[in-house]
C-alpha cells in the first residue's frame, strides 16, 4: 500500500512538473522566467552598462524612455536619460554586470540582471521593443538590492 501511494504521488508530481515546464521555459509573460541566454540586442547594451558608458547606452534609448534609477522614476527624453545615467555612472562606477534572465513576447524583449557598482548591488531590468526600425530601450530600471 505504501509503495502504491508513493508511486501515485511521484506520478502526480511528475505530471505537474511536465505541465508547468513549458510555461516556465517560455516565460509565461513573466520577465523573471525564460531563456538564460540574452538576445543579441542586449549584448551591446550590457557592454555599455558594464563600461558605464552613458553616451553609447543612450543611443539605444527611444526618443522618450521610462527610466527608474534609485527610486527616481520618470518618462524623459533621450538627452535627459543620458544625463541621468551619466550622473549615476559617475556616482556608482560599474564593476560587473550580468544578465541572468531573459524573455520575449511578440515585439518586446526584456532581461533582468545584476550589477555591482560602487560596491553596491543593483537589480537591473531592461525592456526593449521593436517599432519597425529595430529594438530600442523603452524602459530601464536600476534599483539597489
Regions found by a protein language model. Name each.
Residues 1-14:
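N-terminal secretory signal peptides that target proteins for export/translocation
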Residues 121-145:
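Short beta-strand edge/turn micro-motifs at domain boundaries
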Residues 82-121:
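Surface-exposed, charged secondary-structure patches
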Residues 66-74:
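A short gly/proline-enriched turn/hairpin at secondary-structure junctions
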Residues 41, 45, 53, 80-85:
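Stable alpha-helical elements in mature extracytoplasmic
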Residues 38, 50, 74-78:
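Solvent-exposed, acidic/flexible segments
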Amino acid at each position: 500500500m505504501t509503495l502504491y501511494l508513493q508511486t501515485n504521488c511521484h506520478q502526480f508530481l511528475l505530471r505537474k512538473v511536465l505541465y508547468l515546464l513549458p510555461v516556465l521555459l517560455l516565460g509565461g509573460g513573466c520577465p523573471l522566467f525564460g531563456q538564460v541566454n540574452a538576445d543579441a540586442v542586449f549584448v551591446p547594451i550590457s557592454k555599455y552598462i558594464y563600461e558605464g558608458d552613458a553616451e553609447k547606452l543612450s543611443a539605444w534609448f527611444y526618443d522618450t524612455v521610462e527610466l527608474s534609477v534609485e527610486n527616481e522614476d520618470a518618462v524623459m527624453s533621450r538627452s535627459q536619460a543620458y544625463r541621468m545615467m551619466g550622473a549615476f555612472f559617475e556616482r556608482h562606477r560599474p564593476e560587473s554586470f550580468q544578465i541572468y534572465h531573459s524573455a520575449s513576447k511578440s515585439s518586446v524583449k526584456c532581461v533582468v540582471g545584476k550589477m555591482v557598482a560602487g560596491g553596491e548591488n543593483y537589480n537591473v531590468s531592461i525592456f526593449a521593443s521593436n517599432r519597425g526600425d529595430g529594438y530600442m530601450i523603452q524602459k530601464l530600471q536600476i534599483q539597489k538590492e
